[in-house]
């Protein structure tokens, strides 16, 4: 009997503690701050399991025809790339400020089944910024996007631009930000040393964790880019550029200068932010 009473008391204390935590507003809900690892895991696991469960009833039509994929590519560019990016194309600046960060769909296109992709695009996801397209696009358009998302992981930036029939799309805001950051620090001034603590904070704001596994930053469980653990001990950046502070700053600010057809897009990283991110990456040993 004592054990039962003790368990009841513990349960009541736990409920009261949880209620107090919520009521007092102790959890930081700002979009500039990352989720804790346990919260991120709960959110991600809940979302994934819900999609798998509810998408089972979706019947998948024939997918993968050339015209369907081409249509899906065009629709994806207009409606999806603003948040999720595209091969060699960055997300819009506003999307980098969403938390959780919109997923890079290169891995999603491989790991997720077509019925799961359709269900998610059709119904959207609460508390993620992912809208429901059910009443905004026709059903055949949604399936065309699904067909393209399945093709996306195998498409290079050069192929994407060529197949789209125009130059790499980039928002005027991002283009302006990139141009402005190029003249932020005059060559006559000695750049300030990087701040690794700020760098850890800033690296989240540019969505780097969507593609890379970064120690100390909560993000994608299955990153599509190389992990950045022990970056401070590596000899090269991207397998081709000597790993020095100045080279890392140059790489962060304009990666396509070194790999024109690489998947890593230009994000309009400012001089100061690049130096702080560099300082944090150099601390990873």
Regions found by a protein language model. Give the residues of each.
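Periplasmic c-type cytochrome electron-transfer domains
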Residues: 2-77, 82, 86, 93-94, ...
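Short, intrinsically disordered, charge-biased short linear motifs at domain edges
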Residues: 65-70, 193-199
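Amphipathic alpha-helical recognition patches that constitute DNA-binding helices
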Residues: 71, 104, 116, 198, ...
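Periplasmic/extracellular electron-transfer cofactor-ligation site
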Residues: 73, 77-100, 126-129, 153-158, ...
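Short helix/strand-bridging catalytic loops that position acidic/His residues to coordinate divalent metals
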Residues: 99-107, 131-132
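Conserved N-terminal glycine/acidic-rich loop preference
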Residues: 163-196, 209-233
